[in-house]
């Protein structure tokens, strides 16, 4: 397959995504097919975002690593020493993707490391490995193109996470600001009693202890539930089951107490 045809195959994957998140597993499969190598897309912390195997490596440690989708921490950290594409590293290299305990089996193993960079920061690493055949310029062009695409996708996901985080925080702040002084006091006592993200409590006991009416507690819970911050369910005589749905809620509540 010529370089242009291989590039078009990668482009076809991106075009089929059409604004949707690119699946790192599919991306790895396509890279594996066009570059004809084992492909590992590794995050900054060593998480395997995607991988595809062209040549099976019979090694228990490697199999466990793939099952756990996690590269060893020491190896992941060492990858940050590589700041530009390093190709055709042999099995004696500290960066080899082949199991060092089986060097005699993988003497022909070659590894190529491609940093994934986006927005001026290191986002991860693309690791390619194959037996025998060297990585040529065409392979490296495809690898660097792929790493750019992966970098853009990681940046997009990070931007979405930040946006979602801000949205969750805003929802919590609005829900808390909708509470009256007595309702806020009730909520503080409820989650002090709950001491976690979910549990069972008896509203009337809290009302008696704090010196507020049960209706204040009911109204406060209803406001938080309608905002999607918590879920509550009456279990009759047993009390009310409460579960926090928005992970920003308890942090914001704690911050209010310290102010």
UniProtKB/Swiss-Prot annotation:
Native organism taxonomy: Bacteria, Bacillati, Bacillota, Bacilli, Bacillales
Function: DNA-binding global transcriptional regulator which is involved in the adaptive response to starvation and acts by directly or indirectly controlling the expression of numerous genes in response to nutrient availability. During rapid exponential growth, CodY is highly active and represses genes whose products allow adaptation to nutrient depletion.
Biological process (GO), any one: negative regulation of DNA-templated transcription
Family statement: Belongs to the CodY family.
Region GAF domain: start-end pairs: 1-155
Modified residues (Phosphoserine): 215
A molecular-function term among this protein's GO annotations: DNA binding
Gene3D superfamilies recorded: 3.30.450.40, Winged helix-like DNA-binding domain superfamily/Winged helix DNA-binding domain (1.10.10.10)
Recorded superkingdom: Bacteria
Keywords of this entry: Cytoplasm, DNA-binding, Phosphoprotein, Repressor, Transcription, Transcription regulation
Designated name of the protein: Global transcriptional regulator CodY
């Amino acid at each position: 397959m010529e370089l242009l045809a291989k590039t078009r195959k990668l482009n076809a994957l991106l075009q089929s995504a059409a604004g949707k998140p690119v699946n790192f597993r599919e991306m790895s499969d396509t890279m594996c097919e066009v570059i004809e190598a084992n492909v590992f897309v590794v995050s900054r912390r060593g998480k395997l975002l995607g991988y595809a195997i062209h040549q099976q490596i019979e090694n228990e440690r490697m199999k466990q690593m793939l099952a756990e989708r996690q590269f060893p921490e020491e190896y992941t950290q060492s990858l940050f020493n590589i700041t530009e594409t390093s190709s055709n590293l042999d099995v004696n290299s500290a960066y080899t993707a082949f199991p060092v305990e089986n060097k005699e089996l993988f003497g022909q193993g070659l590894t190529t490391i491609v940093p994934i960079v986006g927005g001026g920061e290191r986002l991860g690493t693309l690791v390619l490995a194959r037996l025998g055949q060297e990585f040529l310029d065409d392979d490296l062009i495809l690898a660097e193109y792929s790493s750019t695409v992966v970098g853009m996708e990681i940046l997009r996901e990070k931007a979405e996470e930040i946006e979602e985080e801000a949205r969750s925080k805003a929802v919590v702040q609005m829900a808390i600001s909708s509470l009256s002084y007595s309702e806020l006091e009730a909520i503080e006592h409820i989650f002090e009693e709950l001491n976690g993200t979910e549990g069972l409590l008896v509203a009337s006991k809290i009302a008696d202890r704090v010196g507020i009416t049960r209706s204040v507690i009911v109204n406060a819970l209803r406001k938080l539930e309608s905002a999607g911050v918590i879920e509550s369910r009456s279990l009759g005589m047993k009390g009310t089951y409460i579960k926090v749905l928005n992970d920003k809620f308890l942090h914001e509540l704690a911050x209010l107490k310290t102010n």
